[in-house]
Amino acid sequence: MALISMRQMLDHAAEFGYGVPAFNVNNLEQMRAIMEAADKTDSPVIVQASAGARKYAGAPFLRHLILAAIEEFPHIPVCMHQDHGTSPDVCQRSIQLGFSSVMMDGSLREDGKTPADYDYNVRVTQQTVAFAHACGVSVEGELGCLGSLETGMAGEEDGVGAEGVLDHSQLLTDPEEAADFVAKTKVDALAIAIGTSHGAYKFTNPPTGDTLSIQRIKEIHARIPDTHLVMHGSSSVPQEWLKIINEYGGEIGETYGVPVEEIVEGIKYGVRKVNIDTDLRLASTGAIREFLAKNPSEFDPRKYFAKTVAAMRDICIARYEAFGTAGNASKIKPISLEGMFQRYASGELDPKIN
């Protein structure tokens, strides 16, 4: 079984200059779409359980869903990642369940809504890194708050995210603070704030440099070249699926996501993990609406669920190809979590700060 750490996967991505889409998973259909796309394109996989997914399906169910995928596709390296942990305890529980990577989101207090101060973020992230690395498990941290540079509004996903209007400094990660944070915590990956937000309503117009700061990615990467950067809220919000949803009874207003070409530009400057959820939700919803509208007498869920798998699989394939992930699964030689622990303990994986 090819369950590997996020650190190993992203180190490989950095060495060969590609990015890895990290898809949220809630159910069988999403899991199958992701794995079938990876199988077709020879792509390594990061699947993640968000706070909402853990509440909806339960972490043990998600764990076994992911392990089943690994069993069926043993040739595909898979990282099982816990997204947006709101406390070290949450992360510790995920490690006990067998997750190979966790995110400690110390940018927010334990309620998942109140922006935290810097010292709190450092402290809880340090705690998480200490016990995670002792198990060979990777840790993603976060610095800055997700939200729109266009409106100043914070972004929320599945009950996790700051509330209300944030100031500009909170919405853009400071490169010097990022360097200090990585030096103190030794996180493997860092989620940064550059103007993206969770959900479908990211931008009211196609984003520009004023609302999506690729320049900030470049500045942060220059300071912490060996730390893998993470873009959250990076769905592209396919306009074709918005059109289908609204054509068959939906009421989603005009909205735009993060253009794929902007993500590709970010990958050139250290972005290695790209979080995607909304795109799969839109494709799934559109496929169901269209099928039921065209087949009003059908009531077998397997028939419309099969349509969702195909729709989501196409998006996954497109992202694997665009981000350069395709063709790399077979090149990764899995390292056990015990092996990763030995590398952490030796200091081999300590971050480099410029």
UniProtKB/Swiss-Prot annotation:
<feature type="binding site">
    <location>
        <position position="105"/>
    </location>
    <ligand>
        <name>Zn(2+) 2</name>
    </ligand>
</feature>
<dbReference type="InterPro" id="IPR013785">
    <property type="entry name" value="Aldolase_TIM"/>
</dbReference>
<comment type="similarity">
    <text>Belongs to the class II fructose-bisphosphate aldolase family.</text>
</comment>
<dbReference type="GO" id="GO:0004332">
    <property type="term" value="F:fructose-bisphosphate aldolase activity"/>
</dbReference>
<feature type="binding site">
    <location>
        <begin position="233"/>
        <end position="235"/>
    </location>
    <ligand>
        <name>dihydroxyacetone phosphate</name>
    </ligand>
</feature>
<dbReference type="GO" id="GO:0008270">
    <property type="term" value="F:zinc ion binding"/>
</dbReference>
<feature type="binding site">
    <location>
        <position position="232"/>
    </location>
    <ligand>
        <name>Zn(2+) 1</name>
    </ligand>
</feature>
<keyword id="KW-0479">Metal-binding</keyword>
<feature type="binding site">
    <location>
        <position position="84"/>
    </location>
    <ligand>
        <name>Zn(2+) 1</name>
    </ligand>
</feature>
<keyword id="KW-0862">Zinc</keyword>
<comment type="pathway">
    <text>Carbohydrate degradation; glycolysis; D-glyceraldehyde 3-phosphate and glycerone phosphate from D-glucose: step 4/4.</text>
</comment>
<dbReference type="InterPro" id="IPR000771">
    <property type="entry name" value="FBA_II"/>
</dbReference>
<protein>
    <recommendedName>
        <fullName>Fructose-bisphosphate aldolase</fullName>
        <ecNumber>4.1.2.13</ecNumber>
    </recommendedName>
</protein>
<feature type="binding site">
    <location>
        <position position="142"/>
    </location>
    <ligand>
        <name>Zn(2+) 2</name>
    </ligand>
</feature>
<feature type="binding site">
    <location>
        <begin position="275"/>
        <end position="278"/>
    </location>
    <ligand>
        <name>dihydroxyacetone phosphate</name>
    </ligand>
</feature>
<feature type="binding site">
    <location>
        <position position="50"/>
    </location>
    <ligand>
        <name>D-glyceraldehyde 3-phosphate</name>
    </ligand>
</feature>
<keyword id="KW-0456">Lyase</keyword>
<dbReference type="InterPro" id="IPR050246">
    <property type="entry name" value="Class_II_FBP_aldolase"/>
</dbReference>
<dbReference type="InterPro" id="IPR006412">
    <property type="entry name" value="Fruct_bisP_Calv"/>
</dbReference>
<feature type="binding site">
    <location>
        <position position="199"/>
    </location>
    <ligand>
        <name>dihydroxyacetone phosphate</name>
    </ligand>
</feature>
<feature type="binding site">
    <location>
        <position position="198"/>
    </location>
    <ligand>
        <name>Zn(2+) 1</name>
    </ligand>
</feature>
<feature type="active site" description="Proton donor">
    <location>
        <position position="83"/>
    </location>
</feature>
<comment type="function">
    <text>Catalyzes the aldol condensation of dihydroxyacetone phosphate (DHAP or glycerone-phosphate) with glyceraldehyde 3-phosphate (G3P) to form fructose 1,6-bisphosphate (FBP) in gluconeogenesis and the reverse reaction in glycolysis.</text>
</comment>
<dbReference type="GO" id="GO:0006096">
    <property type="term" value="P:glycolytic process"/>
</dbReference>
<dbReference type="Pfam" id="PF01116">
    <property type="entry name" value="F_bP_aldolase"/>
</dbReference>
<keyword id="KW-0324">Glycolysis</keyword>
